[in-house]
A protein has these predicted regions:
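Short acidic, S/G/P-rich loop/turn micro-motifs used as interaction or catalytic elements
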Residues: 35-37
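Radical SAM/AdoMet-radical enzyme domain recognition
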Residues: 7-31, 40-143, 147-156
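Accessory C-terminal segments flanking Radical SAM cores
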Residues: 149-150, 156-171
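N-terminal pre-core extensions flanking Radical SAM catalytic domains
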Residues: 1-4, 23-24, 168-171
């Protein structure tokens, strides 16, 4: 072992979160600050473990939806049920999403949305606005409605403001 913890496995989760502890939880959010939750090996099994021990808790997850097969997404929807949702962080359409969500293929994103919603999943689409995708907001909103996405959220980004400098003034 190199001493680096890359991800928590289902066995790790079971040793940390005992059923008695899980029963008193109201919610759990997998947000992906250190990587997308869907690339962790045991994400679905971990969520199933939490659901098994607390059918009423709210379970949610943020993802770019760029991985896993249809069966996985359908199973995730079944696991979350009505007491959970997936927040799909998708920043554009086929020709722009990959500009910020690098290496994410649109066809996989679209397939993931469909399989999850067909499985009964509750979906929210978070759309970060950049210069390269702002012209697509209304088209994406319409697509979200057509697909059965419950909520479409537009988020302004200040990540790449042109002309912004952080130079220090000399005294």
């Amino acid at each position: 072992c190199n001493g680096v913890l890359d991800e928590l496995t289902l066995d790790d989760i079971k040793s940390i979160f005992k059923p008695k502890f899980i029963k008193q939880l109201k919610a759990m959010q997998l947000c992906g600050n250190h990587g997308d939750p869907i690339v962790a090996r045991d994400t679905l099994e971990v969520l199933q473990y939490f659901r098994e021990h607390n059918p009423d808790m709210w379970l949610s997850m943020n993802t770019n939806a760029g991985a896993k097969d249809d069966f996985w997404w359908y199973s995730l929807a079944q696991t979350l049920g009505q007491n959970g949702r997936v927040i799909f962080s998708v920043d554009g359409l086929e020709d722009t999403n990959h500009l910020y969500r690098q290496n994410v293929q649109w066809k996989i994103v679209e397939r993931s949305f469909h399989a999850f919603i067909e499985g009964g999943g509750r979906a929210r689409w978070d759309f970060l606005v950049f210069d390269f995708n702002e012209h697509q907001i209304e088209e994406a909103r319409a697509k979200a409605k057509q697909w059965g996405v419950e909520e479409f959220v537009v988020k302004k980004s200040s990540r790449f403001i042109t002309g912004h400098t952080s130079e220090k003034k000399e005294s």
